[in-house]
């Protein structure tokens, strides 16, 4: 299955092929800051699943474990598109909110729950990890 998506201004478009390895809610502090929200919902996949068109910029970051992460975003409007999780080989975390159709992107687990907002209640039916393992 192929899914399409893109940034807010339309300068970046992509097609992602195949199914996600997982759909994950991440509560880490950096995902909160990048999204400007309480968490980020990510399509976890392989870097060869995404065909990207447009000008993306990269912010080199470190995750909460101290590992490098390349955060890719639209160079025009700043919309986060995906992150390359360098410590995990060719894994990417595609921002689900950038997909044109999110109707089948139900999260399966939550990670970095140790960093969640104190006022946020976790779904007790969904597996949760205090960190990422």
Each model region followed by its residue ranges:
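A short Gly-Trp-Pro
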Residues: 1-133
């Amino acid at each position: 299955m192929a899914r399409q998506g893109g940034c807010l201004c339309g300068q970046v478009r992509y097609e992602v092929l195949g199914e996600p390895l997982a759909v994950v809610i991440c509560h880490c502090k950096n995902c909160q800051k990048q999204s400007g929200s309480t968490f980020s919902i990510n399509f976890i996949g392989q870097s060869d699943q995404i065909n990207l068109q447009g000008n993306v910029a990269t912010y080199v970051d470190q995750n909460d474990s101290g590992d490098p992460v390349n955060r890719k975003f639209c160079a025009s409007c700043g919309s986060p598109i995906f992150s390359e999780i360098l410590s995990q080989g060719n894994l990417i975390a595609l921002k689900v909110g950038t997909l044109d159709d999110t109707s089948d992107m139900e999260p399966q687990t939550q990670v970095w729950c140790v960093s969640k907002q104190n006022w946020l209640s976790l779904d007790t039916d969904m597996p949760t990890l205090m960190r990422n393992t």
